[in-house]
Regions:
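Bacterial Sec-dependent N-terminal signal peptides
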Residues: 1-28
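Short hydrophobic segments within beta-strands
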Residues: 37-38, 69, 151, 257
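Single conserved hydrophobic/aromatic residue that forms the stacking wall/gate
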Residues: 250-252, 256-263
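Divalent cation-coordinating acidic motifs and surrounding scaffolds
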Residues: 71-94, 186-206, 210
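Conserved SGNH/GDSL esterase-like catalytic core that processes O-acyl groups on lipids
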Residues: 33-35, 41-130, 159-170
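Short, amphipathic alpha-helical "lid/cap" segments that border enzyme active or binding sites
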Residues: 125, 129, 208-219
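Sec-dependent signal peptide cleavage junction
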Residues: 21-31, 230-248
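Extracellular serine-dependent O-acyl
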Residues: 147-152, 164-201, 212-236
Length: 263
């Protein structure tokens, strides 16, 4: 009887150890690819900042290994970033190109922000939503495992041209909710984005603070989609030049945390 009890205790101890070991083995995020899909807000220009730049910094600092991919390049302080941003083009244009684009650049994650380059007089929202749906379907037909983050786009002070954007954002949210997909995620870039504070003189494109805000929102959304990173860095921002307009050029001195703690 004593031997039987000891045998049972040993089995329970073994099962407990297995349970603890399995729980402790948290899955880490493997290297992944991202496609930024959109218009000039995605592409960037000489007079405003593309939010993919600060997003790159946030992902890198968090210890993720990743690549931005696409046929187009934009220069920034970290070098060049690849993307699928097309200045002056709308979501219908992206829909017409996405099949060939995604076959050439089958990213693990697609970041879609495209709601501008229409006029309110066109009553464009129904057609735009149809294009969003088609983009999703075409991408998923090529890669069923792709994760798509669709943004409710940033508001604009260029009115009445862009006065359709609030309606568009409402319909985007309804569309994503209706899809009920574990692979398509809504990102609310409109909430808290005050164009008076966050856009350049044209009242459309993000300034440095606006790009930083957009990158923060998208980074928080990505953290819910990604597994934990292997490492985390602690950047120290050093200001080495102040421009005439009060903006600054910063350099990040990045070091690895001694604890190697994943976030």
């Amino acid at each position: 009887m004593k031997h039987k009890a000891l045998y049972l205790y040993l089995i329970l101890f073994f099962l407990l150890c297995c349970s603890v070991t399995t729980t402790g083995q948290e899955k880490k995020q493997e290297r992944f690819t991202l496609m930024g899909l959109g218009d000039s807000i995605m592409e960037g220009a000489d007079f405003f900042t593309c939010y993919l730049y600060p997003l790159w910094e946030k992902l890198f600092t968090a210890g993720y290994q990743f690549d931005f991919i696409g046929p187009r390049e934009s220069k920034c302080r970290i070098g060049t970033l690849n993307h699928c941003g097309f200045s002056g083009k709308n979501v219908e244009f992206l829909e017409s190109k996405i099949d060939s684009l995604y076959r050439l650049y089958p990213a693990d994650i697609v970041l879609l922000h495209a709601g501008h380059n229409h006029f309110v007089e066109e009553k464009p929202v129904p057609g735009m939503i149809a294009s969003y749906r088609s983009i999703i379907n075409k991408i998923q037909a090529i890669n069923p495992n792709v994760r798509i983050l669709i943004a409710q786009v940033i508001p604009s002070g260029k009115l009445p041209k862009y006065s359709y954007i609030p309606e568009l954002n409402e319909k985007i949210a309804e569309m994503v909710a209706g899809l009920n997909s574990g692979q398509v995620f809504l990102v609310n870039q409109a909430q808290g984005f005050n164009w008076q504070d966050y856009t350049v003189h044209d009242k459309v494109h993000p300034n440095k603070a606006g790009a930083e805000k957009m990158a923060t929102v998208l980074f928080e959304a990505l953290k819910k989609v990604l597994a934990s990173s292997e490492t985390v860095f602690s950047p120290e921002i050093v200001r080495y030049k102040t421009l005439e307009d009060g903006d600054s050029l910063d350099r990040k001195s990045t070091r690895l945390n001694s604890s190697h703690k994943a976030i």
